[in-house]
């Protein structure tokens, strides 16, 4: 399968294209999509998820397809076999929001799995810029002094030796 997400950041890594959080899937025969209204309705969200920035796909022990989509504003939405099953945000996972935007703005990017099946991600404009959802379902927040409050933190890349590299654009503080 091929996956594609809609939204994200502008060419200067600024926030908000303000596009609906669609996930498009091509299964080598046809395209299909998951409408963000489905996530809003099923997960009782205050708005449609929007501005997806990254996507990570895996399977669980039952061989169900699990998709995580991060967004610039709405945290992370988890899908199981194409159905939204969980929204991760400041209330149940991250414990903090991007400064200056009021309640509920979680700028998440750079989803990547490590060798142990833990899901790593970055979070902009917060004190704990690196977040980990471990394979058991527990959240961990890492405090890296140099990343506190940074305006835009992009991808986290995980190497074959399980090292983590974080991409932070220049001149963005």
Give each language-model segment a name.
Residues 1-173:
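Carboxylate-rich, polar loop motifs that coordinate divalent cations or form catalytic acidic clusters
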